[in-house]
Amino acid sequence: MRATTRRVFVAGPAGRIECAVDSPESSPRGYAVIAHPHPQFGGTLDNKVVQTLARAFVELGYEAWRPNFRGVGQSEGRYDEGRGEVEDLAAVVAQIAGQGIVLAGFSFGAAMQARLAARVKPERLVLVGTAVLNFDVPPVPRGSLVIHGEQDTTVPLAAVLDWARPQDLPLVVVPGAEHFFHRRLHLLRDIVESYCR
């Protein structure tokens, strides 16, 4: 399925939020909001894991929204240690105001989406390489998809297992994958597409 991509701006609590919106050829079945990795370490809406997630959701018929957090790209504001970034995501979800919202995120973005999920009750929650070491990541709803690389040295698999264990939360572990899923992006896409069909 081919997607068309457009840039839009959403009013956020710290100013304009830049978003790339990837639309399927036909009317969307829902909306996926995909959050990028840490803004102070090069995370943007063009991150390859974020783009892979967007392609998977478009293939499934969702419209994929990829916002830049405050202070990144053309988004206004400055980094707020995870507090304001959750509010940025909430502003994007409010702008969409549609049924069938999926929240997805990678690394820092996954931690922020886990925080937002308690407030907006998404249809689905997809967390990839969740940054559980440096951020308070709350328990997530049953049925959430949590994907992690076996060889992740940025957020070791053991740390994610320690976070997931008290929740009885299953994890999908991608063998041989490190934090950025080099040479494993196709597996990441397949997992997401299977989960959200």
Predicted ranges, named:
Residues 1-27:
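N-terminal cap/lid segment of alpha/beta-hydrolase-fold proteins
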Residues 16, 25-68:
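Short, surface-exposed "cap/lid" segments of acyl-processing enzymes
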Residues 49, 78-97:
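Alpha/beta-hydrolase active-site loop
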Residues 105-113:
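Gly/Ala-rich beta-loop-alpha elbow adjacent to hydrolase catalytic centers
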Residues 140, 145-148, 152:
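Short beta-strand/loop motif that positions the catalytic acidic residue
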Residues 153-159:
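Conserved alpha/beta-hydrolase "acid-adjacent" motif
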Residues 182-195:
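Post-His helix in hydrolase/transferase enzymes
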